[in-house]
């Protein structure tokens, strides 16, 4: 599963981003806070929620670990899917959402498109205990919960191969084989290219 990505923004529109990570384009659905910080041609790092279904794979990107965790709690609420969860996180900061749930205050939710009184009440009821019992939601977001700066070249290569539908163990195996044939300072692009070549050759 893809947990986070760092790459160059190629395209942005509405709630959709396309970023280039080591030559692989990833499409993500993101809240407006991420969209506002994304600039075409510049680097962007996001935490990712990766959904695999019969009709395809879907990626949702977030500015912090906390925001992603809130998304995961929101989609567990009855009747709240990924689309509406993105709307909620576009209209409320993580801190504002947590504060509203703790105070059982529906007004912030009612101001958002697609949320009526019954939905707001259901959100407050179902999220309350989860917010109160999860230490992540009981304290301010720390530096350690924000998106990390960079992956190592090998980690980037493994992640790219997994995105291309190799099993994690297989991706790691071929990247390790590639490392043995390349210089120690080989970048992720070289590792990906060599790993694919070795795999095609059936290297053992």
Swiss-Prot record:
InterPro entries in UniProt: DNA_helicase_Holl-junc_RuvA_I (IPR013849), Hlx-hairpin-Hlx_DNA-bd_motif (IPR003583), NA-bd_OB-fold (IPR012340), RuvA (IPR000085), RuvA_2-like (IPR010994)
Q: Could you tell me the keywords of this UniProt record? A: Cytoplasm, DNA damage, DNA recombination, DNA repair, DNA-binding
SUPFAM superfamilies recorded for this chain?
Nucleic acid-binding proteins, RuvA domain 2-like
An example of a GO molecular function for this protein is:
ATP binding
Q: Which GO terms describe its cellular component?
A: cytoplasm; Holliday junction resolvase complex
Compartments, record wording: Cytoplasm
Its Gene Ontology biological processes?
DNA recombination; DNA repair
Positions of region (Domain III): 152-204
Where are the annotated segments for Flexible linker? 143-152
Chief location bin: cytoplasm
**Region entry Domain II, spans:** 64-142
Superkingdom per UniProt: Bacteria
* Residue ranges of the region described as Domain I: 1-63
- Pfam families (alphabetical): HHH_5, RuvA_N
User: Which family is this sequence assigned to?
Assistant: Belongs to the RuvA family.
Domain comment, as recorded: Has three domains with a flexible linker between the domains II and III and assumes an 'L' shape. Domain III is highly mobile and contacts RuvB.
Subunit-level organization: Homotetramer. Forms an RuvA(8)-RuvB(12)-Holliday junction (HJ) complex. HJ DNA is sandwiched between 2 RuvA tetramers; dsDNA enters through RuvA and exits via RuvB. An RuvB hexamer assembles on each DNA strand where it exits the tetramer. Each RuvB hexamer is contacted by two RuvA subunits (via domain III) on 2 adjacent RuvB subunits; this complex drives branch migration. In the full resolvosome a probable DNA-RuvA(4)-RuvB(12)-RuvC(2) complex forms which resolves the HJ.
The name under which this protein is listed is Holliday junction branch migration complex subunit RuvA
